[in-house]
Curated annotation (Swiss-Prot):
It comes from Rickettsia canadensis (strain McKiel). HAMAP family: TruB_bact. Its EC number is 5.4.99.25. The gene is truB. CDD domains: PseudoU_synth_EcTruB (cd02573). SUPFAM superfamilies: Pseudouridine synthase (SSF55120). This is tRNA pseudouridine synthase B. Pfam families: TruB_C_2, TruB_N.
Length: 293
């Protein structure tokens, strides 16, 4: 089985699940997962994990992400983007200087209430399904981190502003846009959203799929990224034959390393064997990969 990453560019108008289905059709019978859903109305980087790489998806889900988004001021929609219904309007449109200056207020650790039109679940039901039938949904605030936020452009004529942000996992850009507008004494919703980076995966290197024809299978595999590429900034320990056997069979495994580590990976014969944590020199595996004999 092939085990690698693909840096795929999701176009606007297609769901993340549909894009995964297209890639499955191209590659054949392989296991594929993605590192973080993009809304149908959004576009951009969608890393796909193939084969054993699916066991490392959570690392990318936890990674920093970057977006470029455009806010339409003066209106609010029920979904937070252009696909929703307008539910409120406000005459005040912020000045250019205000649109630029407001960014500093949001950089750092902040709280955010997720939009009801999201894939979150309440009592086992997706909140967007509840919202569509008019069921009241109350979601709790979440802690997120905005590492960078800056205004790239302000269009006074169309009452829009385009922003760039680098943020932590769990950040909803639609909510960020609404909160930006509210902070500027206005209302706002997202009219364009593009994810430009997820961890090591960047927009400039992303593959744009124009056909589901199996003829492009070789082209995709040629652009594949090694499974260990996302582990470059994580501590690695090399396992002996005995340690490798212990890890494979879920047995206690000790390493000659004294510091406690929340996340590291173990390499055996040059390939990824497992990811896990280290507590008092004892390795606790989170996921074990089947890449070695």
């Amino acid at each position: 089985m092939s085990n690698y990453w693909l840096n795929i560019y999701k176009p606007r108008g297609i769901s993340s699940a549909k894009l995964v289905s297209i890639v499955k059709t191209i590659l054949g019978k392989v296991k594929i997962g993605h590192a973080g859903t993009l809304d149908v109305e959004a576009e951009g980087v969608l890393p796909l994990a193939v084969g054993e790489a699916t066991k490392l998806v959570q690392i990318l889900i936890d990674a920093k992400k970057s977006y470029i988004f455009t806010v339409q001021f003066g209106k609010q929609t029920d979904s937070g983007d252009y696909a929703g219904k307008v539910i409120a309007t406000k005459d005040y449109i912020p000045y250019k200087e205000e649109a630029y200056a407001v960014c500093s207020k949001f950089i750092g650790n902040i709280t955010q209430i997720p939009p009801v039109f999201s894939a979150l679940k309440v009592n086992g039901v997706r909140t967007y399904k509840l919202a569509r039938v008019g069921t009241a949904v109350e979601l709790k605030p979440r802690n997120i981190t905005i590492y960078d936020l800056k205004c790239l452009n302000f269009d006074e004529k169309n009452a829009t502003a385009t922003y760039y942000t680098e943020c932590s996992k769990g950040t909803y850009i639609r909510t960020l846009a609404e909160d930006l507008a509210l902070s500027l004494q206005s209302l706002g919703f997202v009219i364009e959203l593009r994810r430009t980076q997820v961890g090591i995966f960047k927009e400039k290197n992303a593959i744009r799929i124009k056909s589901s024809d199996a003829i492009i299978k070789n082209s995709l595999e040629e652009k594949s990224i090694k499974i260990e590429a996302i582990l470059d900034d994580i501590l690695v320990l090399d396992a002996t034959d005995q340690q490798a056997q212990q890890i494979k069979y879920g047995q206690k495994c000790l390493f000659n390393y004294e510091k406690d580590i929340n996340l590291l990976w173990v390499r055996y014969k040059g390939v990824v064997l497992a990811i896990g944590s280290l507590n008092k020199s004892c390795f606790n595996s989170l996921r074990v990969l089947n890449l070695t004999q």
